[in-house]
Amino acid sequence: MPFLTGVEIYDFRLRRELSRTIYDFRVNYKSQIVNHKSEMFVMFTGIIENLAVVKKLSLKAGGAELLLDIGDFSDEIKLGESIAINGVCLTVKEVKGTVAGFDISRETLTKAALGKLRNAEKVNIERALRVGDRLGGHFVTGHIDGVGVIKEKKQHADQCTMSFSVEKRFTDMMIEKGSVAIDGISLTIVDIADCVFSVALIPYTLTSTTLGHKKTGDQVNIEIDMMGKWVKKILKKENYGGITREQLTEQGF
């Protein structure tokens, strides 16, 4: 029986680990969604339900307080419910009329682009996924990985292309045609180059989310697709005997 080459061993181990990861990923997320009512975990899909208006953002010791006019949503949400605000999972602490209040921790202010919200500015909102809901986008946790900056915005006849500058650790976990959440919006990656990636926005997305009002230089919240994080973790953890990227390319990987 012939010995396996280093590349064949790499291929076998990678496929094995990816299979395990995908299985664990599905089981884990299924249990997280089922346990939503017990508040063990919440998930979102990146499909924006409505736009809310900032009434007031008050910075205070340990974080901030955010007041939003959520309109008709005030009849549906409950105290303690989790809502994604521009992609950031926040808990409803009070509802007075159509205005809902949220506390923002210092860590969240550091990671996300919520601290610069201005009065009357619009934000994307999405309620947590419920058992039985359709998954129109992709699994979004509401835990932001960091902030990106709009580098370029090009308007075409029937769509808009927008590119974002991010840290390289973000693009290392992205693939073309993969998913990414930008300000809580589930979008498909069109192109990736070093520390920049781009997405295409259809007219509906431009009119029903905040991205239609964004301009070059504006900050946005970025959440990388969970699968990309898992794959990077596996590749970082495993030792493949010094096989180089060039060797893998030669073998067709």
Q: Residues of each region from the PLM?
A:
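Intrinsic disorder/low-complexity segments
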Residues: M1-V42
